[in-house]
Amino acid sequence: MSDSGVFAFELGDDLATRCGNTLTGVFVPGSRIALSAYRHVTHSSRDEPTENAGQVPVLIYMAQESTLFDEPVLRSVLAEANATFATLQQLGSRATRAEYVNISRAYRSIVRSCLEKLEQAKKSPEVQTDEARLQRLCDAIVVFYAAECLWHLFEILYIQSNQLVVPQLLDWARFHSPHAEDRATDLLLMGEEASESDDYWSIVKSLIMLGEIDVTRAVLSQNRKAGQTSFKAAEQILKSMPVYQEGYALQKFHSQWEFWHVDTERKIQSGLFATEPELEQLIRLVAGDSEQWDAGIKESQDFYEYLPGYLLFTKPTCKPFELKIAAAKWLNRWCLLRPEREQCSMNRMVSQLMDHDLRLFIYDAQKLNDTHWFSTHLIDLIHHCGQLKSYFDQNNIDLPALRHSMIYEYGSYLMTSHNMWQLGIDYLDCCKQEGQAAIELLLPRITLRSERQATKLINLARQRGLISVEREICKVLSKRSYDNERYGNALEWAIRSKDVLLVTAVADFILKHYSKTGCMLCPDTIANVGGRMFASPRLVFLSKYFEFYEFYRTRDFLSASELLVNLLESKITPDYFWPSLLIDSMPLLESKDPKIFAKETVAILHHIETDLVPIIERDVSKYGKHHTETVFKDYRVENVDEIMNLLRLACARNLARALIIENTLPVV
């Protein structure tokens, strides 16, 4: 893993080139930047159009950061890590060390599974033919390999906190340097012929330097010369090497190990292996010979590759505080022997862990190209297990604040991705007030792909008491349904948004459409509005007019007449609907059997003169002879004057009939 550099770029269009390739940018929702050409202006610049004004188009470029998680194969990492993160929050700070170790291993298991998927995906034909995607997968493998390697080492040194670390370090080194073990498997399958391979001894030496004693013995036992004295002696040395077991007395183990080490040195000095130079070099490695280990260091790729093996043969009971000194010496030795190799960030971070420099380690961990996946989850685990609290206190590091900041940033990143926003909410929920504020800002910006998703968002907002978010989503859905000509849905979502202006606008559209065409839109939705009509006065009018419409359609003229008069008296009739409402009264007024009484008929005449006539006069003065197009938009109207005369005449006739009937005494 190498350090990444800073890349420079330019827009390259005509305007940008003329402006000297200077740019300006504005952040827009979705972690994007809108870039365009820019010419620097100072206090002495003249306030006039530039020479390029109007000559070339102004192009705006939307720049968005690409991340590893844009690759579908990697999204499972986010979901699985989210589940482990939630489990850790439930455990809190009262869990046992074993439970924290299990959580750590769960995170590492997720990464290892991801690496396997990446390796499989990389070998697929469609990826092999797509260079860009192949490069993305290779980059992801490098990043997650580094994350697993560093997490594993951190777990050994700081979460398990064993007194003796060499056995765990050996497992760590073997897993992250599998080449020698893979080749050893090939040699074992070859049998005696393996000893004729050109890389036979280099593989065996690598196995020893990795501490693979049992595998080395198995490979040597198949050598054609395995029956010779020197090979038997080597087998005995490897077999009899003391290995520390937990609970064993340290002093007794040291005595046994010293005896074994001195005996091995004596056999080397006696020339027992002189006839087999390669085997002698191997045994010298086992004895910790500096010259042989220096030769091995020169062949290593990373400084930490053979360090655990060296400790196994020179300091098998190394404790964590001793590892700091041993690792520093080993790194200096490696740098002297490999001066041509620059120390990459991976080597540096391993060194920081072994040197107990967690401040720098956390700083470098945030530079991994994984959108802070590694550093966020690791810091959260550190915070909960509490074993490093004294270290952070001594170094004046506010661990809770650091954790809060990392989780907040990571959760905000997930919230800006249309595929991962639901995971981001779980992280922001851990950030208390700031997290709630972020959710309130980011939830309405999520691209709504379906009403099902919108319902899920609304439920999430409702659970957190984010009423404004719920209403904002409803407004978006209402406007989208309106644009798609789904007016029933538009009205339903508008009512749920409780936005008076939006409800009024949708109701206005339905009323205007009816007055123009005579067709009532979304009758089922209007019929089921019920008590929600009070969201807007216009919706109240629409609901009540729809009731009148239904009474009229079912020929319940008395109820229709009563409701019509109530609407006229309600003072909530919109100006544009007065003509339609009054025209609706004409069939009722012309009925031979009066449906509207004298008092109500006078009221209708009053509304004609005090409400409709002023509207007509106002529009005549404003639009002249075209006023008919602005006031009388009812589909039943052709001539204004004729309709006005018919309305007055219908009122006069109905008034006469009503007065006669109302003032005639019944015959006894």
Curated annotation (Swiss-Prot):
Lineage: Eukaryota, Metazoa, Ecdysozoa, Arthropoda, Hexapoda
Family the UniProt entry places it in: Belongs to the nucleoporin Nup85 family.
Pfam families: Nucleopor_Nup85
A Gene Ontology term for the protein's cellular component: nuclear pore outer ring
Protein localization: Nucleus, Nuclear pore complex; Nucleus membrane
Protein function: Component of the nuclear pore complex (NPC) that seems to be required for NPC assembly and maintenance. Required for nuclear import of phosphorylated Mad via importin msk. Has no role in classical nuclear localization signal (cNLS)-dependent nuclear import via importin-beta. Facilitates the interaction between Nup93 and sec13 with msk.
Name assigned to this protein: Nuclear pore complex protein Nup75
Gene from which the chain derives: Nup75
GO molecular function, one term: structural constituent of nuclear pore
Organism: Drosophila melanogaster
InterPro entries per UniProt: Nucleoporin_Nup85 (IPR011502)
Principal subcellular localization: nucleus
GO BP annotations, alphabetical order: mRNA export from nucleus; positive regulation of DNA-templated transcription; protein import into nucleus
Keywords carried by this UniProt record: Membrane, mRNA transport, Nuclear pore complex, Nucleus, Protein transport, Translocation, Transport
